[in-house]
């Protein structure tokens, strides 16, 4: 048996583009986006794809074609949205450290809203907007102090986290923002974490934020939208992920008759299970205490296992009638932490292709050049067709900015 992405066998993609190779299913991207649209249809939401999950231009372009808005956290991500044909007027600018240059870029581009996360940021956006003679549409990201029950590195809604304005300080912060002449308050935002597998924290956060919405309205600050962020998890192994329909019903019931536009910022749940990392076995190494399957992908290609001790299902692309072994699936990087899977039972040998599942989110977007390794190519599959959406990086491209400096030094010395 051979594994396929849609109607294309993975070995054909490996032959055409080499490995390691990120492979994405266009139909899976579409299905995930439409799942949100259908589940929340009664609330007519603006679904803003979180670009940080995977910023490939072709993926952004595809979501734009479906009517998606975008959630960005940097000027670079905004540039990607614009380059891919995304609509700035449907783009939310989040993030705790927006520079003046990024704010100016976003104001000139006409983003829908800035999610402000601190008093100093309120001051900075006011300053830049005044200098440009513009009015900045803003909301405040409020930290509801709700435990997302996820990995601590991706929990963002507790008092101890760097994100957002403390719940107890929210009313005061809104009144301060309302006094700024170049800011227009249009919404409220929260985002409590990523890879949530329990619905209750999401509902609790919504409840707490709506209490603030009512308190603000009573004091004359009437909001136009409610941004509940993202965070809905996906299945990597055996997780029970929240049902979007149940989530939508809970949110609809909580919003009730309030006239609030709902904004959602999903990332992982749109792209995570739409992508896989295709890799080839270099060696099988048998040891006294541990066996190792050495592959040509590594932690620089997929950081999640090393960073979060995250699980990704790994399987052989072609079924063979050979003995299985239990081994760690590891890359060639000089780190003991360079692993893609631990203690996996698999049947493979040198030259075989392996598929690392659920790698569409925080895979390519977190890749690096550690050990001077080139970043992987990326392919998008649509039915029986496929196309390259990112060329494999070359050593010349990897070293270009440094070589230019060396050449300039040489010219100056001469």
Swiss-Prot record:
Co-factor requirement: pyridoxal 5'-phosphate
Binding site for substrate: 268, 304, 308, 335, 362
InterPro entries: Ala_racemase/Decarboxylase_C (IPR009006), DAP_deCOOHase_LysA (IPR002986), De-COase2_C (IPR022643), De-COase2_CS (IPR022657), De-COase2_N (IPR022644), Orn/DAP/Arg_de-COase (IPR000183), PLP-binding_barrel (IPR029066)
Pfam families xref list: Orn_Arg_deC_N, Orn_DAP_Arg_deC
Binding site for pyridoxal 5'-phosphate: 231, 265-268, 362
Active site: 334
SUPFAM superfamilies per the UniProt record, alphabetical: Alanine racemase C-terminal domain-like, PLP-binding barrel
Physiological role: Specifically catalyzes the decarboxylation of meso-diaminopimelate (meso-DAP) to L-lysine.
Family under the similarity heading: Belongs to the Orn/Lys/Arg decarboxylase class-II family. LysA subfamily.
Listed name of the protein: Diaminopimelate decarboxylase
Organism: Neisseria meningitidis serogroup B (strain ATCC BAA-335 / MC58)
Gene: lysA
């Amino acid at each position: 048996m051979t594994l396929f992405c849609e109607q294309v066998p993975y070995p054909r993609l490996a032959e055409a583009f080499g490995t390691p190779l990120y492979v994405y299913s266009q139909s899976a991207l579409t299905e995930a986006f439409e799942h949100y649209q259908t589940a929340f249809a009664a609330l007519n939401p603006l679904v803003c794809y979180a670009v940080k999950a995977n910023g490939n231009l072709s993926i952004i372009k595809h979501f734009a074609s479906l009517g998606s808005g975008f959630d960005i956290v940097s000027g670079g991500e905004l540039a990607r949205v614009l380059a891919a044909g995304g609509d700035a007027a449907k783009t939310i600018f989040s993030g705790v450290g927006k520079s003046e240059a990024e704010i100016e870029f976003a104001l000139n581009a006409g983003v829908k809203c800035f999610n402000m996360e601190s008093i100093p940021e309120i001051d900075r956006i006011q300053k830049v907007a005044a200098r440009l003679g513009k009015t900045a549409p803003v909301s405040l990201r409020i930290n509801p102090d709700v435990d997302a029950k996820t990995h601590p590195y991706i929990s963002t809604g507790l008092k101890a986290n760097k994100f957002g304005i403390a719940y107890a300080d929210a009313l005061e912060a809104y009144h301060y923002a309302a006094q700024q002449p170049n800011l227009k308050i249009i919404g409220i935002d929260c985002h409590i974490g990523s890879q949530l597998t329990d619905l209750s924290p999401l509902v609790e956060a919504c409840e707490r934020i709506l209490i603030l919405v009512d308190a603000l309205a009573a004091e004359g600050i009437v909001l136009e939208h409610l941004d509940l962020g993202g965070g809905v998890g996906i299945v990597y192994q055996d997780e029970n992920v929240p049902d979007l329909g149940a989530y939508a019903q809970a949110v609809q019931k909580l919003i009730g008759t309030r006239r609030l536009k709902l904004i959602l910022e999903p990332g992982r749940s749109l792209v995570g299970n739409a992508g896989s990392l295709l890799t080839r076995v270099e060696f099988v190494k048998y040891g006294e205490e541990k066996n190792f399957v050495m592959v040509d992908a590594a932690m620089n290609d997929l950081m999640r296992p090393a960073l979060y001790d995250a699980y990704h299902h790994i399987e052989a692309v072609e079924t063979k009638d050979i003995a299985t072994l239990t081994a760690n699936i590891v890359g060639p990087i000089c780190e003991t932490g360079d692993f893609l899977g631990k203690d996996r039972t698999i049947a493979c040998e040198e030259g075989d292709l392996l598929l690392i599942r659920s790698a569409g989110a925080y895979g390519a977007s977190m890749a690096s050049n550690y050990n001077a390794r080139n970043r992987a190519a990326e392919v998008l599959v649509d039915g029986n067709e496929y196309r390259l959406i990112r060329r494999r990086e070359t050593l010349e491209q990897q070293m270009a900015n440094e070589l230019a400096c060396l050449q300039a030094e040489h010219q100056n010395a001469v």
